[in-house]
Curated annotation (Swiss-Prot):
The gene is hisS. Keywords: Aminoacyl-tRNA synthetase, ATP-binding, Cytoplasm, Ligase, Nucleotide-binding, Protein biosynthesis. PANTHER family: HISTIDINE--TRNA LIGASE, MITOCHONDRIAL-RELATED, HISTIDYL-TRNA SYNTHETASE. The keyword Transport does not apply. Disulfide bonds: none annotated. Coiled coil: none annotated. GO terms for molecular function: ATP binding; histidine-tRNA ligase activity. Its EC number is 6.1.1.21. It comes from Leptospira interrogans serogroup Icterohaemorrhagiae serovar copenhageni (strain Fiocruz L1-130). It is found in: Cytoplasm. InterPro entries: aa-tRNA-synth_II (IPR006195), aa-tRNA-synth_II/BPL/LPL (IPR045864), Anticodon-bd (IPR004154), Anticodon-bd_dom_sf (IPR036621), His-tRNA-ligase (IPR015807), HisRS-like_core (IPR041715), HisRS/HisZ (IPR004516). This is Histidine--tRNA ligase. It catalyses: tRNA(His) + L-histidine + ATP = L-histidyl-tRNA(His) + AMP + diphosphate + H(+). Belongs to the class-II aminoacyl-tRNA synthetase family. PROSITE patterns: AA_TRNA_LIGASE_II.
Amino acid sequence: MENQKNFLTTAPYKGTRDFYPEDMRLRNWMFSVMRETVLSFGYEEYDGPILESFDLYKAKSGEEIVERQLYDFIDKGERRVAIRPEMTPTLARMVAGNLRNLPKPVRWFSIPNLWRYEQPGKGRLREHWQLNVDLFGVDSHRAELEILLIADSILKKFGAPIGSYQIKVSHRKLLDSFLKNSLKLNGDQVHGVSKLLDKKSKISSEAFETEMKPFLNNFKEQFSLIETYLNSNLETVSKIPGIDTNSVSFIQNLFQELGELGIDKQLLFDPSIIRGFDYYTGCIFEVFDTNPENRRSLYGGGRYDNLIGLFSKEQLSGIGFGLGDVTLKNFLEGHNLIPNLSREKTIFLPIMDESLFVDTFKLSKELRENEILTETMLDSAKIGKQIQIAEKKGYRYVLFLGESEIRTETVQIKDLISGEQKSLPRKGLSDTLKKDFQL
């Protein structure tokens, strides 16, 4: 019996993706739109290591991440390290390490890849890329105003129409006052109820009620108050006994100024917004997709006033958000916002004859020097086969340079979509291609 070789699988690791060229075109386009938007607000790009000390995440990340989602191991130097599940702890370490040299306010952003060990599903993978936007050194609500403007501007830059998304806003001090003052819960109860509120949208109302019972002393009265809180608006929430009215006033003032800047239609006060990370201390928000087939949180963030406390005695207020590429892609697909990303703006240059190789490459060099993307064949296969390659790669325009074109100082250009072919003068060719063919 002939021995059979066991080949390795070609599938990527569970929860990760291969990015073929067409996938990279989409990813690069998404990243470029995000990058251009954030840069327009004066932010600077940074990056950090994919490996950090385990202790950094143990101290700064949420319980769920550290206990169940972290990829961690002991390195060859017997140090416990982890692959970054989020960027904020690295950001805090970097800012604290250079705090005195950084002009305030600090406006930074990054688009790192992040890892979490969790069950892959729609909008959720083990490896993803995430835009992180952070602003340090502004205590007033103007920091929230700018961050929310950026969060809104990104989707508008992608062409998202009004009504395709909502920005839901709340405040951690509002929640804390409700749990501690209104419900009169102790530390363990506060923790348990807070976690349940955070996952309320992911479980049934019956499960929510059942899981809430162990944390409440007077279930009927307290659960009724929880329902009142979750269904309240900015006017009614302030009437709940024990509520921090300063937080309500903060959101009201923020909404007023944002409305004057034209994003009031997207804004919604929603006290059910919790944000699972333990480091949020003030205003929190989430951006939701309104598509009936993808009603979920796209991204979110909030205020974290004590983030660098582990590294420095100095106080520095901060606010930021993270936007993942997986949920963004689902949003863009759901609202038909992804443009044609084919290679129509790249010239394909076949080799008409082996003797014309150098002449053809001189032409391609001329085009590239004039910022026209050009792919040149490297051998003189049958011209029909070369055209098939161009079609398969998604090219629209093919330039032909044969002996007759060299004699007459012209080129032939063919539109593979329409089938039209015509002669162009070699002189001023790059300008003609840019003007008449939008290349």
